[in-house]
Amino acid sequence: MRMKAMRMKALLIGSAAALLAAGAAAQDITGTILIKKRLTRPSVTAPVSVYQRGTAVKLGADAEQDPIAYERSRVVVYLEAAEGPISAGAAVPDAGAKAEPAEQVEQLDRRFVPDLVVIPVGSSVSFPNMDPIFHNIYSLSKPKTFDLGSYDKGETRKVSFPKPGIVEVYCHLHPNMAATVLVTPNRWYARPDRMGHYRIPNVPPGKYTVVAWHKSAGFYRKSIVIEEGHDQSVDFLIPIDVDPTQDAQANQNPNEAGGSH
């Protein structure tokens, strides 16, 4: 029994040492998302809406001061692993890492706020109703199908997402409401800043595909090899000849998307 315990302890120590070594050798992936002009069709809501309970609420129009920065905000960059610790599901230890806060999508003024959230597989999203009316949130997407039923102001319902992919979320009662939950296959993802710069830190050595997804333009992929001691820079040019009405075709499951750009 004592010998078995000693072997188990040695195995645990060896596993921890391997993960720490991977963390020490981890590199950064950085890059820039280049977008030349607006790709998304502006959506404008009516200036005044009367809720079903008779409460008049003023709704603001989508007025973007910086259309290109707005387009960059609709981009997510993440990794798909071919070989290496990420493909095996290993987590690289980070002494300074903090627990990620739960994502939340509010139902506010008959809109989803925000209308795009990114979570790693296995995480959840809360959907609080902030409006003085009922909402009924649902999705028919392959990675996650759900229907939360009707619920009133002040109530919150949560959905977990066990599979990676694109999940389009709608409201049965308000057809204009739409949001997207992008579920990444791991925790190595980033969203660019207003200038289009992104950074994915602590990537272990291995072979990967860097995926850039734009909510209207779809998926773009580049293969890279991360070697110890060498960071990588990967830029993406999002085409300008995209029909913004084709969101449904662009927003397919990344595991089912046909062809790389």
What is each model feature region?
Residues 1-15:
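Bacterial N-terminal signal peptides that target proteins for export
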